[in-house]
């Protein structure tokens, strides 16, 4: 389908739900999570993609299982196994930090860079504009610090709507990416928040009769404060991202 529509797969991202956790105290749980990640890496290879973005811990888990030293060791060991699998499959790994309200383990850029460096010379990082806005004192310096290891960049505005609908200065952000020589994907990852009150400016945004959606996918979307969106609303959000970013790149 991708080839028929002249679309290239850039990569994918792990959905770290339920018991998926590369820094879990339980060894069997970590092993299961590593296998899931390796399966995702193989999927990217089969789609002829380039990179696999990995969130180390369970999304939504904000309480640690062990000491900082223990969890760092578990993370490095787990990711090293995934890293070696990625090298075998020809897929580059990217560690993604997500904000402190979604994880306790790796939530800002310097942590992701330190983890990538501990894993291997070709292990990269993925940064996300939405999370950068929450966690970084200077997001542009964080991007500059990732020079040479940045292999994916997720785009959504400060309110997690489409680019241009929050207060990110996209011209400045794209300029910073160009400064460090980044020429990879700008992966659209808006998660439009759903307003369930009478103040909702987009009352027709929610899809009331969804098809082809697994319970896991639905759970992931809803736990991010969003919902299943209508095709019209989703397409509009994608178009807004394109309208904002394409003139800048």
For each of these PLM feature ranges, what is it?
Residues 1, 17, 22-24, 64-66, ...:
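Short secondary-structure transition/capping segments
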Residues 1-6, 11:
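Aromatic-lined substrate-binding rim segments of carbohydrate-active enzymes
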Residues 4, 23-124, 216-220, 235-236:
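Active-site acidic/histidine proton-transfer and metal-coordination neighborhood
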Residues 7, 91, 182:
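Short phosphate-binding/catalytic loops that engage adenosine nucleotides
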Residues 11, 53, 94, 126, ...:
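Conserved beta-strand positions in the central sheet of alpha/beta enzyme cores
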Residues 14-17, 57-59, 91, 98-100, ...:
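Active-site beta-loop-alpha junctions enriched in small/polar residues
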Residues 18, 25, 67, 97-100, ...:
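Residue-level detector of alpha-helix boundaries and kinks
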Residues 48, 106, 110-124, 133-249:
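Histidine-acidic metal/acid-base catalytic patches
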């Amino acid at each position: 389908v991708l080839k028929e529509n002249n679309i290239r797969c850039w990569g994918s991202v792990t959905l770290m739900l339920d018991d998926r956790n590369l820094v879990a105290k339980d060894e069997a749980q970590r092993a299961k999570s590593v296998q899931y990640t390796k399966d995702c890496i193989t999927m990217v290879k089969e789609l002829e993609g380039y990179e696999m973005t990995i969130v180390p811990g369970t999304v939504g888990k904000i309480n640690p299982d062990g000491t900082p030293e223990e969890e760092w060791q578990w993370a490095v060991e787990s990711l090293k196994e995934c890293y070696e699998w990625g090298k075998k499959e020809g897929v580059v790994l990217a560690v993604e930090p997500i904000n402190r309200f979604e994880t306790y383990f790796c939530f800002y850029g310097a942590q992701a860079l330190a983890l990538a460096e501990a894993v291997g010379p070709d292990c990269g990082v993925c940064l996300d504009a939405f999370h950068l806005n929450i966690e970084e004192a200077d997001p542009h310096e964080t991007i500059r610090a990732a020079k040479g290891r940045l292999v994916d960049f997720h785009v959504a505005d400060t309110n997690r709507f489409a680019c241009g609908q929050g207060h990110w200065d996209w011209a400045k952000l794209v300029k910073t990416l160009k400064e460090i020589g980044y020429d990879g994907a700008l992966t659209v990852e808006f998660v439009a928040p759903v307003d369930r009150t009478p103040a909702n400016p987009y009352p027709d945004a929610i899809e009331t009769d969804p098809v082809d959606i697994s319970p896991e996918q639905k759970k992931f979307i809803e736990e991010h404060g969003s919902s299943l969106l209508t095709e019209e609303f989703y397409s509009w959000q994608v178009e807004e991202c394109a309208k904002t970013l394409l003139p800048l790149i």
